[in-house]
């Protein structure tokens, strides 16, 4: 074998070796994942933590439910009718994840891998009037479901594995270095590989941070969703108005008391002129 052939062979071996170590590194990173859902006081909420090199790099708390339409035969066995399966993310799910500087991913599997949820987060920088600003967002959701699973699907036609994907998704947009929090329900539509079917993903009680976690197992400052901020304002506004009204009443009473006291101390001038002779 000539020198050129040996060099090519050596280069191929080096590439294979690098690919092997890269795959091993990813595998090790994915193994550093914890399901802490048992710590949640909300039985519907799951808690997932991804750690790399002994440090938390992704934290996610949320409750998830999927509304999945599927076809069944009508009673005449000629027509098809559409039913809906409601699939909730359950505790004890298997979880994998990976963290990157600009891209992080969370994968969750449950019911013997009949269901798989994949969430992809990206961090981006944008030029604004204030300068360069970085944000992160949920850029892709994929839900794989098996309609032959009998717990949620009853006699589904063409039962089997289907994949539902988001389309041009930009959700949970949050300034970099902050966590996203939203107690209100949020819906994301997913186009299914099952023809003409749209899966609806419902998220609630969300608290997520896929980048820039400073303290282990601790979320950074929260960026609240607009719905939560509006609800918080609606809750505090009556209290603020009540305090203002109470303050106005107190001020009015004080002014009345001062005025009444000043009036009482003034010399009373008799209206009847005949009384002047008794004065002095």
UniProtKB/Swiss-Prot annotation:
Residues 30-235 are extracellular. GO terms for biological process: establishment of protein localization to organelle; presynaptic modulation of chemical synaptic transmission. Pfam families: Lamp2-like_luminal. This is Lysosome-associated membrane glycoprotein 5. InterPro entries: Lamp2-like_luminal, Lysosome-assoc_membr_glycop. Glycosylated. Residues 1-29 form the signal peptide. GO terms for cellular component: cytoplasmic vesicle membrane; dendrite membrane; early endosome membrane; endoplasmic reticulum-Golgi intermediate compartment membrane; endosome membrane; GABA-ergic synapse; growth cone membrane; late endosome. It comes from Rattus norvegicus. The gene is Lamp5. It is a single-pass type I membrane protein. Residues 257-280 are cytoplasmic. Glycans are attached at residues 35, 53, 102, 127. The lineage of its organism: Eukaryota, Metazoa, Chordata, Craniata, Vertebrata. Belongs to the LAMP family. The chain crosses the membrane at residues 236-256. Plays a role in short-term synaptic plasticity in a subset of GABAergic neurons in the brain. Keywords: Cell membrane, Cell projection, Cytoplasmic vesicle, Endosome, Glycoprotein, Membrane, Signal, Synapse, Transmembrane, Transmembrane helix. It comes from the Eukaryota. It is found in: Cytoplasmic vesicle membrane; Cell membrane; Cell projection, Dendrite; Cytoplasmic vesicle, Secretory vesicle, Synaptic vesicle membrane.
């Amino acid at each position: 074998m000539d020198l050129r052939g040996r060099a090519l062979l050596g280069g191929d071996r080096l590439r294979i070796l690098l690919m092997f170590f890269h795959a091993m590194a990813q595998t090790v990173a994915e193994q550093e994942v914890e399901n802490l859902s048992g710590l949640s006081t909300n039985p519907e909420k799951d808690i997932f933590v991804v750690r790399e090199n002994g440090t938390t790099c992704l934290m996610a708390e949320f409750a998830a439910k999927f509304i999945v339409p599927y076809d069944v035969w009508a009673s005449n066995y000629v027509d098809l009718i559409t039913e809906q399966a409601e699939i909730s993310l359950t505790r004890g799910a298997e979880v994998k994840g990976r963290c990157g500087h600009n891209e992080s991913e969370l994968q969750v599997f449950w019911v013997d891998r009949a269901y798989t949820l994949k969430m992809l987060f990206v961090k981006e920088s944008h030029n604004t009037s204030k300068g360069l600003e970085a944000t992160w967002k949920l850029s892709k959701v994929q839900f794989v479901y098996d309609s032959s699973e009998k717990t949620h699907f009853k006699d589904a036609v063409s039962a089997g594995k289907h994949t539902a994907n988001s389309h041009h998704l930009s959700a949970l947009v949050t300034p970099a270095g902050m966590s996203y929090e939203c107690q209100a329900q949020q819906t994301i539509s997913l186009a299914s590989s099952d023809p003409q079917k749209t899966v609806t993903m419902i998220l609630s009680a969300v608290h997520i941070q896929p980048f820039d976690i400073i303290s282990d197992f601790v979320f950074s400052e929260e960026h609240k969703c607009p719905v939560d901020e509006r609800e918080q304002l609606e809750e505090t506004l009556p209290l603020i108005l009540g305090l203002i009204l109470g303050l106005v009443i107190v001020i009015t009473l004080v002014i009345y008391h001062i005025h009444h006291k000043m009036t009482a101390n003034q010399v009373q001038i008799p209206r009847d002129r005949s009384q002047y002779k008794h004065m002095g």
